């Protein structure tokens, strides 16, 4: 798969195990932002760049354990208009800085950075739990929960998310119940849920979810459709992606 050009930036992806896909585009267009944003499993840098574009004052940090992906993501960032506000770090979430005590930081970019925490975290996480491994070890690492179990993901988010922050993720329908259950065990509350259908007659194939450390009202839940009956992008899909697609 070749390069992927958006309105304000371009994604080179020949050295990345996971290419630009619908899930990343949806999450980058939907997730809640903040002053300081963390993208867990940043891959090509797509979601990091989308968040930087949507939130012009935000500082964005993307982390990934694949050195090749991080190298290419840095190149994508440097070729973008957002190079001064996006940083790519090569490390595991489990080894990334911040402490649980730091989550009480003031809700300013300076206060959050000083404490090593974020007021918005996003992730398109590994989701294959019990399926056959791909012979490509890097693609396996990017897609299977072996490299980042859901519980480890939520433990990292709990450590790095400010008290008033929001964590947003996208997962396939078949693991959404397990994902939400793991969040509850770590003390998170589901505050927003969006099921996404490919076409109207189908069941949702994926869910976008937002979590907080305390209950937020009103709770939002809805289902959207990506394609209309003519096979074109739906009004909803066009609206949330219009800043990005040419």
What does each of the following model-derived ranges do?
Residues 27, 124, 153, 211:
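Residue-level signal for inorganic ion chemistry
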Residues 201-246:
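SAM/dcSAM-binding transferase cores
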Residues 125-152:
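Mobile active-site "lid"/loop adjacent to the S-adenosyl-L-methionine
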